Amino acid sequence: MRLLLGLLFSFTVATVVGLGATWFALTQGTAFGAIAIGAWTAWPKTGTASVDPYARAAIARNGELPIGSGDGVAFFAVEDDRGRLLDGRCDVTLAGTTPQARFWTLTLYDLEGQMIANSLDRQGFTSQEVVRNADGSFAIVVAPRARSGNWLPTGGAERYVLVLRLYDTPVGVATRASREVPMPSVTLERCP
């Protein structure tokens, strides 16, 4: 009887720990195979057959369709370069250049992965429509109120996620350092 109770207790503890670890990995995001460059994080293996089981479960849970590894990579930013969460009531500037890519998109989502409604019905920019400086760099202001130049409205969302998708790019699994890949800076400028 004592052996049976010990086995039952061990099984219960193992189940709770396993389910708890899985829940944590799915809700908090895991860094298995992640590339982190400044405020940007990408998981280049999500579009491959060798994706880790936690990422596979997160993809199934979110219902997203990841970019195939031969097509490109998606970088996500939920905070600025200093680690402050992106707030839709604040002005945030993305400045600099992107890694080499045939085409890129920058899109604004809420924390549930839905596009944020706003008065302009603009949720992002592409590499074809962004206004650039003479040196090829750009500055995009993500803010609740209209700004001149490249303005991406937040629609008053409290928190949001920026997604930079690079198509036909050499950035991938072998990329490890920010000196290898120039990513736009994410800077919190002003908050009410």
Where are the regions a protein language model picked out?
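A compositional/structural signature for long, glycine/proline-rich flexible linkers
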Residues: 1-192
